[in-house]
Structures are given as structure tokens and as C-alpha cells.
Amino acid sequence: MKPGIHPDYHVTQVTCTCGNSFVTRSTAPNGVIRAEICSSCHPFYTGKQKILDTGGRVARFEKRFGKRK
């Protein structure tokens, strides 16, 4: 690595609005990052994810443009 061209890499405390916090490394200058969502409260990781109605979208597309054979 060339000296003097890379940003400083600090130990950083990340705090989520849900109250979860963890330590990582980052180039954040003050060593603190506030996040709105993390793996503890994100719906994908908590299992509370809602499945979108993609079947209805496909049916509507086929109705408008015809189903290919």
C-alpha cells in the first residue's frame, strides 16, 4: 500500500435505533455511526418479512400482453 493515500481506519461503535450496538472498523472520523436499521431489527433477518403478491403481477402482465407459447 502506498503511504499517505489511504484514509485512517478506526475502531467504530455502530448503534442502531432499536438499541443494538456492535463494534466494527470504519473510516468514520469520530468513531461513532448511528444506523436506523440493523440485523437485529431488519424484517429479513427477524423472519417478519412480508411476501409481495408477485403472482398477481404476473397474471396482470399475461392478461395485458398475452401469454407466449
From Swiss-Prot:
The protein's matches in SUPFAM superfamilies, at most eight in alphabetical order, are given as: L28p-like
Asked if the keyword DNA damage belongs to this entry, the reply reads: no
Query: What does the entry's cofactor note say about binding and number?
Result: Binds 1 zinc ion per subunit.
Q: Which InterPro entries match?
A: Ribosomal_bL28/bL31-like_sf, Ribosomal_bL31, Ribosomal_bL31_A, Ribosomal_bL31_sf
What Gene Ontology molecular-function terms does this entry list? Answer: metal ion binding; rRNA binding; structural constituent of ribosome
* GO biological process entries: translation
Alphabetized UniProt keyword annotations: Metal-binding, Ribonucleoprotein, Ribosomal protein, RNA-binding, rRNA-binding, Zinc
User: Could you say which residues bind Zn(2+) here?
Assistant: 16, 18, 38, 41
Cofactor names = Zn(2+)
Q: Which GO terms describe its cellular component?
A: ribonucleoprotein complex; ribosome
Q: What does the record note on quaternary structure?
A: Part of the 50S ribosomal subunit.
Q: Which HAMAP family match?
A: Ribosomal_bL31_1
Q: Which family does it belong to?
A: Belongs to the bacterial ribosomal protein bL31 family. Type A subfamily.
Report the protein's function: Binds the 23S rRNA.
- Protein name, per record: Large ribosomal subunit protein bL31
From which organism does this entry originate?
Thermobifida fusca (strain YX)
